[in-house]
């Protein structure tokens, strides 16, 4: 009762903002990075289309997102009106990741809430056809990181990549980013051990979603190219987005024993845990059954272990047969328990999935507190889905507290903070 009352006060009296200093981009030590999709477009942003909000024009039967973002702080030139959608009889709006003003605003929020930086998703399957679109968002990120003092690094998502060409596509695009866009020359590009961090997500996953390669030697050769065989200016600290069961080669991981050497070759292991558990009890079991042995294995391999945590999950609009609010957020308890357990198990760094992933209901950006604040048409999740009164920035606040915990600024506590505040 007391906790709900305190949260209700927060809705009316947001805390004063503490402006955090620039993040040290030279090391991954104690960092908490958040995935950033940056894939939303609308017709008025120059793309001439709606992307990721829906299949075509947004409507109840075309929506592919769950959470409705809180747009109250966005200016008129950041809002895209949605034809046929209303909120209380007034026009409904969405945003575009192509708008530099909006991306800058997102990074300003990260600074206000004390988040370290982002892993920007870049999709291998779209590079040949849509590289210019990805470049627009990347340039927005580079400018926003500079303004806010947050770090950023590239994270390639290989889902749907051509098994025959994805490796060369990765190499060519990385050389393009280094030579033409000068990403690794940016003062806020995330580095570690003197090299830029590069993440490649999806190798070794065996979930039926088309993650090449199937041959572990191809994967190992690719890692070695990025770490040591390319020209010096392209060398990286290699982060691998792996199956959650990378350590045992079971469940969502390919079972060929040769994959163990692939994972051992990575500098940073980032297992994908999203959707692998859905209750607090399961989170606790996951710590003992998976994270604790993972930490030991990574230490034996002299690797950085970077588990992934997520606030909840729902993709009813994206997968129409999926149930609504599939993995409830439990007012932040689910999110907090994962981060606390990871810290107590020995993890030194963390990834949060994701900043803006409203598609699968994992976003931590500001979203509406009440269903009535979302469009009247269609299914939408709001922060009151679990019956709690929460401010729209609740998950940014919690992410900030998680970051402070990993920085060593606060002691790990299994209890959810009553009033997490912007730093």
Region locations from a protein language model:
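Bacterial N-terminal signal peptides
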Residues: 7-17
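N-terminal secretory signal peptides that target proteins for export/translocation
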Residues: 1-4
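Glycan-processing catalytic domains of CAZymes
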Residues: 22-423
């Amino acid at each position: 009762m007391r906790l709900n009352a305190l949260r209700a006060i927060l809705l009316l009296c947001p805390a004063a903002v503490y402006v955090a200093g620039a993040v040290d981009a030279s090391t991954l030590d104690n960092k908490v990075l958040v995935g950033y999709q940056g894939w939303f477009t609308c017709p008025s942003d120059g793309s001439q289309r709606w992307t990721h909000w829906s299949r075509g024009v947004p409507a109840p039967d075309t929506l592919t997102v769950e959470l409705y973002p809180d747009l109250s702080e966005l200016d008129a030139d950041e809002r895209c009106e949605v034809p046929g959608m209303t909120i209380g009889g007034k026009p409904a709006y969405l945003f575009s990741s192509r708008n530099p003003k909006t991306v800058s605003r997102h990074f300003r929020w990260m600074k206000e809430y004390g988040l370290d930086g982002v892993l920007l998703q870049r999709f291998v399957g779209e590079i040949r056809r849509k590289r210019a679109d990805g470049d627009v968002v990347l340039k927005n990120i580079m400018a926003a990181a500079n303004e806010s003092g947050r770090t950023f690094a590239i994270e390639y998502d290989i889902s749907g990549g051509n098994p025959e060409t994805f490796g060369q596509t990765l190499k060519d695009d990385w050389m393009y980013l280094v030579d033409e866009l000068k990403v690794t020359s940016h003062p806020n590009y995330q580095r570690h051990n003197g090299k830029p961090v590069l993440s490649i997500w999806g190798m070794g996953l065996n979930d039926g979603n088309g993650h090449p390669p199937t041959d572990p030697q191809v994967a190992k050769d690719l890692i070695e190219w990025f770490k040591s065989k390319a020209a010096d200016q392209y060398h990286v600290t290699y982060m691998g987005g792996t199956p959650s069961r990378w350590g045992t080669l079971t469940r969502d991981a390919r079972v060929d024993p040769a994959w163990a050497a692939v994972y051992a070759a990575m500098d940073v292991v980032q297992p994908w845990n999203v959707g692998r558990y859905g209750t607090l009890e399961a989170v606790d079991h996951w710590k003992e059954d998976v994270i604790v042995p993972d930490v030991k294995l990574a230490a034996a391999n002299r690797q950085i272990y970077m588990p992934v945590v997520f606030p909840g999950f729902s993709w009813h609009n994206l997968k129409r047969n999926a149930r609504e609010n599939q993995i409830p957020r439990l007012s932040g308890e689910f999110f907090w328990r994962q981060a606390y357990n990871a810290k107590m198990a020995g993890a030194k760094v963390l990834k949060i999935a994701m900043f803006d992933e409203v598609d699968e209901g994992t976003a931590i950006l500001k979203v509406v507190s009440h269903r009535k604040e979302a469009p009247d048409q269609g299914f939408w999740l709001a922060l009151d889905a679990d019956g709690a009164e929460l401010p729209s920035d609740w998950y940014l606040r919690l992410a900030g507290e998680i970051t402070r915990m990993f920085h060593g600024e606060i002691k790990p506590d299994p209890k959810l903070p009553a009033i997490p505040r912007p730093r």
